[in-house]
Regions:
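Motif-centric detector for short Cys/His coordination patterns
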Residues: 1-88
Length: 88
């Protein structure tokens, strides 16, 4: 699908650069407030930088993953092509 993640690169801190199958690219920021429940391991800044792509999905070696379609929609709709994952 067009929202499949093709590439992820660690930028710094809690930011990742992502590129999708249709060429859209942007930045994903994972705020500490998001890292609760199953995502609690992402409180570890070092783990954030170990993101990989597996079959079009952004994931981590411990099995955590993020829905690529939601990430794509949020990056596309933001003029800065940035998606900030936060708990409200």
């Amino acid at each position: 699908m067009y929202w499949d993640v093709l590439e992820v690169k660690y930028i710094a801190g809690r930011e990742l650069a992502v590129r999708f199958a249709d060429g859209l690219a942007g930045v994903l920021y994972i705020d500490h407030s998001f890292c609760t429940g199953v995502f609690e391991p992402l409180q570890n800044d070092e783990l954030v930088g170990h993101a990989i792509v597996n079959n079009g999905v952004l994931m981590w070696p411990n099995g955590l993953d993020l829905a690529p379609d939601t990430m794509y929609k949020e990056i596309k709709r933001n003029p800065n092509h940035r998606y900030e994952l936060r708990r409200k």
